[in-house]
A protein has these predicted regions:
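Alpha/beta-hydrolase active-site loop
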Residues: 167-190, 249
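Alpha/beta-hydrolase fold nucleophile elbow
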Residues: 192-204
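Short glycine-enriched nucleophile-adjacent loop
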Residues: 208-220
Length: 289
């Protein structure tokens, strides 16, 4: 593995990064494509990352979006088939990973953007060993990217009914993260040996549904050129009425009224996920249909 100066270095619009070279594949892990989503950025559209001047290490996978964690260790066969890698969880989770066979070698390789499964509530870009892009980059001679984005109640709480215009994107923040990631790829992937005019988005299960939603989002128009949805598709998720009622139920569960929506931005994420889960359970009990 090579990591000395000048090896596995690439420029991005926000600053230079240094990954590593292993078995002739360049790997870059945990590159920020957006700012920390905590605090005042919670429920908001993704913001650009802060620029940096010095070479930034890109050798460790970024944090996963906060999510419920289920201990699978006692289930030996489940662990054998699905080796789940959650690692750190936190709201500074807008990170992507890149594997490429070449840097600044004059080639324009196809780009494959992988969207993980997990039903919009769980997962990350490297949760399973098969999501590691080294081999597909090598044997396909492509640039492979995987993405972390907001999930569950932090990515899809519709608070616009209570919070008004400020929160109008809160119910779709997680998908807007993915749009921001593909925009970043469009702007920067040429520096990693990729062709921004040949980008495919691909996902499995919940990731397949995300692919279908991207195809329907005006904000994603022109950012990719092919799409592959594996064992998952989406025509419609929750309707607007349900989403708004759930947002109001979360406020009620937190003991807040509509004038206090901003207070939800300062609730620890662990507590917020629990509030949202209780609100969802209460709504289901009140209206089981």
């Amino acid at each position: 593995m090579y990591k000395r100066q000048g090896i596995a270095e690439a420029d991005t619009e926000y600053g230079p990064v240094r990954g590593f070279l292993l078995r002739n594949i360049y790997s870059f892990r945990g590159i920020p494509y957006g700012d920390d989503t905590g605090g005042k950025n919670r429920f908001m559209p993704p913001q650009p990352p802060h620029a940096w001047q010095e070479i930034r290490p890109a050798v460790a996978f970024g944090a996963s979006s906060p999510q419920p964690f289920y201990d699978r260790r006692p289930e030996s066969y489940s662990m054998f088939v699905d080796h789940w890698n959650y690692d750190l969880m936190g709201e500074d989770c807008l990170r992507l990973n890149i594997w490429t066979p070449g840097l600044a070698d004059g080639k324009r390789r196809p780009v494959l953007v992988w969207l993980h499964g997990g039903g919009f509530t769980q997962g990350n870009g490297i949760e399973q060993d098969s999501y590691d892009g080294e081999n597909i980059a090598r044997y396909g001679d492509i640039v492979f990217c995987s993405v972390n984005h907001r999930l569950g109640a932090l990515g899809f709480s519709d608070l616009a009914g209570a919070g008004g215009e400020k929160y109008r994107h809160s119910g779709n923040a997680g998908m807007l993260d993915i749009v921001a990631a593909v925009k970043w790829i469009q702007a920067n992937i040429a520096n990693f040996g990729g062709d921004p005019s040949n980008v495919t988005v691909m996902g499995q299960s919940g990731g397949g549904s995300k692919v279908c939603l991207l195809c329907a989002m005006p904000a994603a128009k022109g950012l990719f050129h092919k799409a592959v949805a594996l064992s998952g598709n989406t025509v419609k998720a929750n309707n607007a009425d349900y989403a708004e009622r759930l947002g109001n139920a979360i406020l009620h569960e937190a003991g807040l009224d509509t004038s206090q929506v901003d207070s939800l931005q300062s609730v620890p994420w662990e507590q917020y996920l629990e509030l949202a889960n209780r609100a969802r359970q209460r709504m289901a009990a009140e209206d089981p249909g």
